[in-house]
């Protein structure tokens, strides 16, 4: 009789089985963070647009 052994464990790629879900979650978090930052910039521009433009021009537009 042949002796067969089975090893139960993970394959090299198995530990990242849920990676697409994680990547989607991280992408959404990054997008939300970017949206929040843009909203904050919009708010600053609405309240201090003239000052923002003045300081931007003083720095040479860079």
Curated annotation (Swiss-Prot):
Q: Where is this region: Disordered?
A: 1-36
Listed GO molecular functions? Answer: proteasome binding; protein tag activity
Where do we see the Isoglutamyl lysine isopeptide (Gln-Lys) (interchain with K-? in acceptor proteins) cross-link in this protein? 62
Q: Name one Pfam family in it.
A: Pup
Question: Which residue ranges are recorded for the region named ARC ATPase binding?
Answer: 18-56
Instruction: Report the domain of life of the source organism.
Output: Bacteria
The record, for NCBIfam families, names: pupylate_cterm
Q: How does it assemble?
A: Strongly interacts with the proteasome-associated ATPase ARC through a hydrophobic interface; the interacting region of Pup lies in its C-terminal half. There is one Pup binding site per ARC hexamer ring.
Per the entry's comment, what about the domains?
Answer: The N-terminal unstructured half of Pup provides a signal required to initiate unfolding and degradation by the proteasome but is not needed for pupylation, while the C-terminal helical half of Pup interacts with ARC to target proteins to the proteasome.
Q: What is this protein called?
A: Prokaryotic ubiquitin-like protein Pup
Q: Which organism is it from?
A: Corynebacterium kroppenstedtii (strain DSM 44385 / JCM 11950 / CIP 105744 / CCUG 35717)
């Amino acid at each position: 009789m042949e002796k067969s052994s089975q090893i139960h464990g993970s394959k090299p790629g198995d530990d990242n089985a849920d990676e697409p879900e994680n990547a989607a979650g991280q992408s959404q978090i990054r997008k939300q963070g970017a949206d929040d930052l843009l909203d904050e910039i919009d708010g600053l521009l609405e309240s201090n647009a003239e000052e923002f433009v003045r300081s931007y021009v003083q720095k040479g537009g860079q």
